[in-house]
Amino acid sequence: METKSDYEDAVFYFVDDDEICSRDSIIDLIDEYITWRNHVIVFNKDITSCGRLYKELIKFDDVAIRYYGIDKINEIVEAMSEGDHYINLTEVHDQESLFATIGICAKITEHWGYKKISESKFQSLGNITDLMTDDNINILILFLEKKMN
């Protein structure tokens, strides 16, 4: 079992990156990013102290707000904090819903950080590999490549 000290010393491989990672690493990138969002809150880190890649992913929060609306996001975040709920990550069907889903997952784990809830609970959100289908990986890579150049 991971202790708070282990979590505080966690290594985030993509956090300082200024370029897109390989296609093979994109699932790890999204999983790590969502975990990192909890980590920066729990350990009072500077969320802006990251590379361009994470800064682009942080912008997905705004996509989530436009896509769902702030009231719906607050409702989802609160519901996810009150029990073992599950977000169906297979309901993503276009670029905007993909980015909004990544944004809302990050907002949920960030909120858990404020409530001192472990990011390991993220597994209850759903399997990140359900979200990162081949089509969604392609969408994300093409978008990030444009932003990183």
From Swiss-Prot:
Predominant location category: host cell
Description of what induces expression: Expressed in the early phase of the viral replicative cycle.
Annotated localization: Host cytoplasm
GO cellular component: host cell cytoplasm
Pfam families membership: Poxv_Bcl-2-like
Gene3D superfamilies in the cross-refs: dsDNA poxvirus
Highest taxon above the source species: Viruses
Keyword list, A-Z: Host cytoplasm, Host-virus interaction, Inhibition of host innate immune response by virus, Inhibition of host NF-kappa-B by virus, Inhibition of host RLR pathway by virus, Viral immunoevasion
InterPro entries: Orthopox_K7, Poxvirus_Bcl-2-like, Poxvirus_sf
Cystine pairs: none
Biological-process GO terms, alphabetical: symbiont-mediated suppression of host innate immune response; symbiont-mediated suppression of host NF-kappaB cascade
Function as written in the Swiss-Prot or TrEMBL entry: Virulence factor that affects the acute immune response to infection. Bcl-2-like protein which, through its interaction with the DEAD box RNA helicase DDX3X/DDX3, prevents TBK1/IKKepsilon-mediated IRF3 activation. Contributes to virulence by binding to the host TRAF6 and IRAK2 and preventing host NF-kappa-B activation.
Subunit structure: Interacts with DDX3; this interaction inhibits DDX3 and suppresses DDX3-mediated IFN-beta promoter induction. Interacts with TRAF6 and IRAK2; these interactions suppress TLR-dependent NF-KappaB activation.
Family to which the UniProt record says this protein belongs: Belongs to the orthopoxvirus OPG044 family.
Protein name listed in UniProt: Protein K7
